[in-house]
């Protein structure tokens, strides 16, 4: 019986790669055309599904061709080709099935299991979509691992005994990640990760396409933007020019018979693009790579001088301006000992071999890229799992109700770095009902977050009194938009002072409401006998506090809370009921501090 092989797959935006471990070392498998990378392109023609090189060859002539589908993974968007709407998972599954088939031909037996890589900044929906695509393709996806982490595995496999810190800069066709890892005694620990889910080589191509469109408008008085075939040819020519400019100072773009115009000669385009022009038109894209590097270093709490190596991953790192930016920021030459197109798949194969027990003494410790939490009273985002926390992890915290006789709570799960829930990404929500009717602050609702090794999150809420529970696995969040990914941490830093002030205002108001509710309840219950004169003073303070709550005068409210607490404590002393009163005061403080649902 043939030995079971777990293949490693880098399912890329532009190209995909499949690898296995043979005799303890990762090996990239060539496709049926003898190439080590396979274009992530699917074409439909005469009822046949064509994948890879042959599909890419049809981009310019066959409108039923799909490329860069990875950018739609985890969204509700579809692509209309072959007279049908296809979900991104379906197209990705066709690519995976193609990789699976040629792997089986190379290995000589059936392949059923795989480790697939994703960008570190992929959210839950995108990770789930990747697993679903694998399932459609007939693969059991044993593990989803982050691309920079996989690259580090491949780079460091023969260096596991040497302690070192490495930065992996991963710029692919459609996504960008920076991860910092520590390698020591066979452990690959991710210290931090940052990135942009919507930045990649496609964006550099698109800048050349825009330049060509403008050139054609100016020189030929023709707009080709509505001509699908012409645009496909421009895109292909732009990609080729970008690649040429990585090794040459200029690229010649030739597009014969680009547009056939009725009653006139066909338009043929010939243009020369200099590297200096290309770098000028794409400088804003290069600059977008800066912040994630700085964020990853800050989150890892290390200095640039602490880095032992810098690894460039992804075909887009061949762009000279990108290399120059990385090396200028880090003041270190990048290590070019790995193939940027292949190293991620090789790392995935290594992880597969670890899972299969073929490779020992290697432990991978990854992290979650953004903070996860829930919305609590006043719209506060209460974090449960901070960004760059090791996974897998389970974390629980107890919350309570905000209203008297509240029989249901809504759990809203948010992702991001801002203190207010509305300014973060809403990943999902669910209701927990059947809570026993009780005064606010009495029910105990335990909320548990579980992030598995694939980075997929499950949230469970349980009423500790009735044991009723409800849970959700985050599958329906859409992909973080370009602006959200790029701005999320930057906004948090820029607005930290204002956010903190707003969050403090909300917390102060909630504290005041809880205090008033607690004191009124204690006095009305008659558990403590307070002299009428003192009771009148407290009632006046409570009235003033309520007015300040309505007016949202937070600074005055803080002072009045202190005065109310002082007056109440004096009244208790006057009542000379120390034991009972001490207990009451402790309970009051506890209630004031407890976080609640609205």
Swiss-Prot record:
KW Cytoplasm (keyword) present: no
Q: Where is the composition biased (Low complexity)?
A: 571-591
Q: What induces it?
A: By stress conditions e.g. heat shock.
> Segment Disordered: which positions?
571-598
A Pfam family name for this chain? HSP70
InterPro entries listed in its UniProt record: ATPase_NBD, Chaperone_DnaK, Heat_shock_70_CS, HSP70_C_sf, HSP70_peptide-bd_sf, Hsp_70_fam
Its keywords, alphabetically, are:
ATP-binding, Chaperone, Nucleotide-binding, Phosphoprotein, Stress response
Where does the source fall among the domains of life?
Bacteria
Keyword Mitochondrion applies: no
What's a Gene Ontology MF term here? ATP binding
Q: Which residues carry this modification: Phosphothreonine?
A: 175
What the protein does comes down to: Acts as a chaperone.
Recorded hits in NCBIfam families, A to Z, give: PRK00290.1 (NF001413)
State the family it belongs to. Belongs to the heat shock protein 70 family.
Q: What is this protein called?
A: Chaperone protein DnaK
Source organism: Mycoplasmopsis agalactiae (strain NCTC 10123 / CIP 59.7 / PG2)
């Amino acid at each position: 019986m043939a030995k079971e092989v777990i293949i490693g797959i880098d399912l890329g935006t532009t190209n995909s790669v499949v690898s296995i471990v043979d005799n303890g070392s990762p090996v990239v498998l060539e496709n049926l055309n003898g190439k080590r990378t396979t274009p992530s392109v699917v074409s439909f023609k005469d009822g046949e599904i064509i994948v890879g090189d042959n599909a890419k060859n049809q981009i310019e002539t066959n409108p039923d061709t799909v490329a860069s589908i990875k950018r739609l993974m985890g969204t509700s968007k579809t692509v209309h080709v072959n007279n049908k709407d296809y979900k991104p998972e379906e197209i990705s599954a066709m690519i995976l099935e193609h990789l699976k088939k040629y792997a089986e031909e190379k290995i000589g037996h059936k392949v059923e299991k795989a480790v697939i890589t994703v960008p570190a900044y992929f959210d839950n929906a995108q990770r789930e979509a990747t697993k679903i695509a694998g399932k459609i393709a007939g693969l059991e996806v044993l593990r989803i691992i982050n691309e920079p982490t996989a690259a580090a595995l491949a780079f460091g496999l023969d260096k596991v005994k040497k302690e070192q810190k490495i930065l992996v800069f991963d710029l692919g066709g459609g996504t960008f990640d920076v991860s910092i890892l520590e390698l020591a005694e066979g452990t690959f620990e991710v210290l931090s990760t940052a990135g942009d889910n919507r930045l990649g080589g496609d964006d550099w191509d698109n800048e050349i396409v825009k330049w060509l469109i403008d050139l054609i408008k100016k020189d030929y008085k023709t707009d080709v933007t509505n001509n699908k075939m012409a645009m496909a040819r421009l895109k292909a020519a732009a990609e080729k020019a970008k690649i040429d400019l990585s090794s040459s100072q200029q690229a010649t773009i030739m597009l014969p018979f680009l547009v056939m115009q009725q009653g006139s000669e066909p338009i043929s385009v010939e243009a020369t693009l200099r590297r200096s022009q290309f770098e000028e038109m794409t400088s804003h894209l290069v600059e977008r790579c800066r912040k994630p590097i700085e964020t990853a270093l800050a989150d890892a709490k290390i200095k640039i001088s602490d880095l032992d190596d810098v690894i460039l991953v992804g075909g887009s790192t061949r762009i000279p301006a990108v290399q120059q930016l990385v090396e200028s920021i880090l003041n270190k030459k990048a290590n070019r000992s790995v193939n940027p197109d292949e190293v991620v798949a090789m790392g995935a194969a290594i992880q597969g071999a670890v899972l299969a027990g073929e490779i020992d003494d290697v432990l991978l410790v990854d992290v979650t890229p953004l903070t996860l939490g829930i919305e609590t009273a006043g719209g506060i985002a209460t974090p449960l799992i901070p960004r760059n926390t090791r996974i897998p992890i389970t974390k629980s915290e107890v919350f309570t109700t905000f209203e008297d006789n509240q029989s249901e709570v809504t759990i809203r799960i948010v992702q991001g770095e801002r203190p207010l829930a509305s300014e973060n990404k809403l990943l999902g929500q669910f209701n927990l009902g059947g809570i026993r009717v009780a005064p606010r602050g009495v029910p105990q609702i335990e909320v548990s977050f579980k992030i598995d090794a694939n980075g997929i999150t499950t949230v469970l809420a349980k009423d500790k009194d009735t044991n009723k529970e409800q849970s959700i696995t985050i599958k329906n969040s859409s992909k973080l938009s370009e602006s959200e990914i790029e701005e999320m941490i930057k906004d948090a830093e820029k607005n930290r002072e204002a956010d903190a002030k707003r969050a403090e205002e909300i917390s102060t108001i909630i504290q005041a409401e809880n205090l008033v509710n607690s004191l009124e309840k204690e006095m009305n219950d008659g558990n403590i006998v307070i002299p009428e004169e003192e009771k009148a003073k407290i009632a006046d303070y409570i009235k003033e506090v309520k007015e300040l709550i309505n007016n949202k005068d937070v600074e005055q409210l803080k002072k009045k809370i202190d005065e109310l607490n002082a007056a109440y404590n004096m009244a208790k002393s006057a009542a000379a009921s120390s034991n009972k009163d001490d207990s009451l005061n402790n309970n009051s403080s506890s209630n004031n501090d407890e976080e609640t649902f609205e």
